[in-house]
From Swiss-Prot:
Gene name for this UniProt entry: ncl-1
Taxonomic classification: Eukaryota, Metazoa, Ecdysozoa, Nematoda, Chromadorea
SUPFAM superfamilies: B-box zinc-binding domain (SSF57845), NHL repeat (SSF101898)
Region (Disordered): 71-91, 176-211
Species of origin: Caenorhabditis elegans
Name the record gives this protein: B-box type zinc finger protein ncl-1
Residues annotated to bind Zn(2+) 1: C132, C135, C156, H160
Function text: Translational repressor that inhibits protein synthesis. Represses the translation of mRNAs such as fib-1, probably by being recruited by RNA-binding protein nos-2 and the Pumilio proteins puf-5, puf-8 and puf-9 to the consensus core PUF binding motif in the 3'-UTR of fib-1 mRNA. Negatively regulates ribosomal RNA (rRNA) synthesis, ribosomal protein synthesis and nucleolus size. Its role in the negative regulation of nucleolus size is most likely through its negative regulation of the translation of proteins such as the rRNA 2'-O-methyltransferase fib-1, and dao-5.
Zinc finger (B box-type): 127-174, 218-261
GO cellular component: cytoplasm
Regulation: induction: Negatively regulated by the let-7 microRNA.
Gene Ontology BP annotations: negative regulation of ribosome biogenesis; negative regulation of transcription by RNA polymerase I; negative regulation of transcription by RNA polymerase III; negative regulation of translation; nucleologenesis; protein localization to cell cortex; regulation of establishment of cell polarity; ribosome biogenesis
Coiled coil: 303-331
Amino acid sequence: METQLSVQLGLDSLLTDFGLESVMNKQQQLFANMGLSDIGAPTPSTAIPVPNAHLHPSMVAGSDPSNPVVGFGFGSPSSTTSSSPPLSNSPTIEQQQHAQLTAMMQGIMSNNNVAVSNGSGVQVASVPAVHCSGCKSNETATSFCQDCNANLCDNCTMAHKFMHCFADHRVVSLTTPGTGSSSSSTSSSSSASSTSSHQVPSLGGKQSPDSMMLGSGKRSVLCLQHRASELVFFCVSCNLAICRDCTVSDHPSGTHQYELIADVADKQMLKMEQLIADARSKHADMLDMFKQVDNKQQVLTASLHNAHAQLEETVSNLINVIQDQKKTLAKDIDNAFAAKQIQLTMVDKRIQSMADKLSQTIEFSRRLMSFASPAEVMVFKQLLDTRLQLFLGFNPDTSGVLMTPCEIEYLGAAGLFNNSASTVSQLLGSVHGGSPINNAPAANDFLMPQAGLAPIGRAQSRIIPIEQNQLARSPPHHIAGSLPMNAYSDSNLLRPNKDFGGSSQSLGPFNPLGASVPGAAADPFSSQYDKWSLGVEPSVGGLLEGGNVDEEKFQTLFPPSRSQIKRQKMIYHCKFGEFGVMEGQFTEPSGVAVNGQGDIVVADTNNHRIQVFDKEGRFKFQFGECGKRDGQLLYPNRVAVNRTTGDFVVTERSPTHQIQVYNQYGQFLRKFGANILQHPRGVCVDSKGRIIVVECKVMRVIIFDMFGNILQKFSCSRYLEFPNGVCTNDKNEILISDNRAHCIKVFSYEGQYLRQIGGEGVTNYPIGVGINSLGEVVVADNHNNFNLTVFSQDGTMIGALESRVKHAQCFDVALVDDGSVVLASKDYRLYLYRFLPATSGQSTSSASSQI
């Protein structure tokens, strides 16, 4: 395949060689399929000028499939009707014939028999005759106009010869078969000249491409500007091939340097080869860069998803921090309200008591003055004078409660909302797009509020300044002067010294980086709002407010932090349960107890039933169904067992808030307490069969007998914050776990507050309490891990354990006589942990192992 440059194609012809070669190969294959091999190919001695269309390939005689097409010229067509001269010579006649055959494929004639003749009048082949398409006469066509693409009759052919509108049209004559006559290919500008059978018709009277072949066999190339001149020079100054005429007109020797093409061709081609090699190298580099761009695009896309995920996580964590802080502030508001309410209640009681006494005295004096004799009046005069003088001098508001404002003022950080956008952006961090940003906050800036910036919702006075690298709990004297203790009054401060309960008082956030528990330092959100509390005696209240406390006295007020307690690891030896409504499945196992045979009793709240398992976790039986009738349960939340009779005692939360009693086989016995109880939270049965119920929200303890009669009830609102578990010992003492006070409160059956066991840093957020077979107090909490802390009856810590498996949230726990504890978790499973060696003795110190 050779390429001839032309004005029409230009440089694009170099870029389309392979496409045209493919076209020619397809045409050659098509010729073979259409039967040209049966007709025969034209010989080189026969020139066949054929029009562009309307001829079937089978009309050409002499086709030979063994004679392949060897080339095709892409310059000016080498035919007698060419309107422009060629730029180069054709090396072979086969290329000329192939071009003519290609022109034949543009149209197929049918229905008439005509023959195509060459310029010398030689009949090539007979074809069906066609009619004139240039006029309406419908006469037989005798010629074909390539420019009009129409078959012409004799009249139309004559018009093409003499009319100016058809000037320069290329007309090819057609002869009827059998006549043997022929007409030459004509042009309107000049009559067609016949040629010999071995010649190719001239192109417009100019030299044919075959005559332009050089003697050496090389092709000559004509100048694009001077069409008759051959390119023989190369202008080095202009980097352009020129002819002799160009050296005179456009490239004079004085200003342009040019040489013969034969002399500089090799050197210039070497330069071109070097440029091509450089281009190949550049192309390879561009391919590598394309791969790099693709890799960068993939990395960029991955980083986009990662950045969005991190942003969502940061926002979620920030929302959680705000929610936790909201709960803390809500608790502070409730504490402030409770303290103020208790102060007003005490003043109210004193006023009411004094008013009753004064009313009685006035009534007695009136009746004395009305019905007694003067002598009798004089007998009581001194007494009445003294009593009335005391009444007149009585001041019920000795603490000035009525003189101080009673409103609860929330000191929100209102100034932060003026620049809330910048504040939130600092908390959320910034975006790095691959280049360093000068104003990006440091990594540690996110862990602590900036100087002078209080946490959201906190007043500036409650910020506790600490050092950035202070990871341990700060000594008490560091914060004694900075905490306004009077901002968090507790009800215990208003009681006499003998009644003071010493419950933990929430003092708000400690230090942002004071991680006192393992893993807290790794969480920047939880560490910023780490809570600490302090059991305060009234005798030291003034010292705390004054801030003049030495370190030794102050350290005695702090319970040991969690990091100072070495807890032994324990693992569970049994696990059972899953989510569902079938046997052995739970939707909310919120209460658990153990009977005298070691069976595990579970209150499945949302399934409205009680399930009983053996100590290996195998299902035994169940009772209860949803409803309010006898034998039906509605949201049972706690369960206890009477060790003497084996009866089950079940408490229900709202809307029924009552107690139901079933025998050991699950048969209904009785129910009571619906009009008495409000928010039952914990229940146990002591050794004498008395039912002790502790209520949250109203902070009340009610003692029933097994038939529902009230034996005792008393309020614990001054001591409890959020009770969630209860048990008794053999000393007629009631032990109540307080989740928010982080300790165990001990009361007598008459409601007298006795003592506290545990405290924050030791029993954080307890979920239950019980007495084991050795008479020891076992406190369970769910802070970070599932923890067990063992105390003596007087509050001395004996041991501490923690689970190897982290339990996110737990409902309830119960003790087993073999030294195990049953844990009801919010993952719908029950776990059995063994924390004491197995003992054969039964519990003698408590009738309840309920935690």
